[in-house]
């Protein structure tokens, strides 16, 4: 009597995956991780990888899928050590407002006030300057070993984690995303994948519809305390031009509320001033 081993067929699995996407089915947390593993295995040509991104975008990413994608990317990133109370101040970008890099300015102010900040960022996409553009202009060396950044966070209370150094998996998708020229699930993943594995964040998103879902994703990923914010003016920031929509994650619960500049004792500003 002979037995026949059941051998996994990645190409067949990939075809089944793409059929599921074409039919509008959701993948869930584990399904998304499996999908990205298949797509990164070398068997998927760029056109299939692009079709996957578009299929998920057209249907709309679920919180479970975003969570699964973040887990996959986190499992493949280079990590750095940081104190338990470290925070990140970061945004998705993509708000097309053309403002200066507010989160980097906020990082400097927060660190000066005593917060421990492990700032994660990259170059500009739609703003006048990305975090790395600003810091490079200030003379900060970006391409330093993780141990140096870890020491800066511990000793100075602030360090910058330049995304390309810590996320080799993102590089394979970069030309595909550039060719598409559209927002995809990857626009959400950078802010969710801080190499210092912080559990406290202020995270700006480019759409009001993402505020509470991303707070839910952070809860699933183990964040302890976070604000997810979006300005009524379209900014992925706490805005000074009007209302900011906030979802606060704290101790496992999520609270939604609105803030105005007046709540913080600030005058209203304009987009042009920013």
Explain the meaning of each model-derived region.
Residues 82-90, 118-124, 185-192:
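Core alpha/beta catalytic barrel or barrel-like domain that forms the active/cofactor pocket
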Residues 2-98, 113, 269-271:
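Acidic, glycine/proline-rich low-complexity segments that act as flexible tails and inter-domain linkers
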């Amino acid at each position: 009597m002979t037995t026949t081993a059941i051998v996994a067929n990645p190409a067949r699995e990939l075809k089944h995956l793409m059929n599921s996407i074409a039919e509008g089915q959701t993948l869930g947390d584990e399904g998304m991780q499996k999908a990205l593993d298949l797509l990164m295995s070398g068997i998927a040509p760029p056109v299939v990888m692009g079709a996957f991104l578009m299929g998920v975008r057209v249907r709309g990413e679920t919180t479970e899928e975003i969570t699964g994608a973040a887990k996959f990317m986190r499992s493949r990133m280079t990590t750095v050590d940081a104190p338990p109370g470290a925070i990140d101040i970061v945004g998705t970008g993509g708000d097309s407002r053309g403002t200066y890099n507010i989160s980097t300015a906020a990082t400097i102010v927060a660190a000066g006030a005593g917060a421990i900040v492990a700032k994660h960022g990259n170059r500009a996409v739609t703003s006048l300057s990305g975090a790395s553009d600003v810091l490079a202009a200030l003379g900060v060396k970006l391409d330093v070993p993780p141990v140096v950044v870890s020491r800066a966070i511990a000793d100075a209370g602030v360090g910058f984690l330049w995304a390309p150094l810590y996320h080799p998996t993102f590089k394979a998708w970069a030309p595909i995303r550039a060719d598409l020229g559209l927002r995809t699930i990857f626009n959400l993943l950078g802010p969710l994948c801080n190499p210092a594995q912080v559990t406290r964040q202020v995270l700006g998103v480019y759409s009001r519809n993402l505020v509470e879902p991303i707070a839910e994703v952070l809860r699933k990923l183990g964040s302890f305390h976070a604000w997810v914010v979006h300005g009524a003016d379209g900014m992925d920031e706490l805005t000074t031009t009007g209302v900011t929509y906030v979802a606060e994650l704290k101790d496992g619960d999520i609270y939604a509320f609105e803030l105005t500049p007046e709540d913080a004792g600030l005058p209203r500003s304009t987009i042009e001033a920013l």
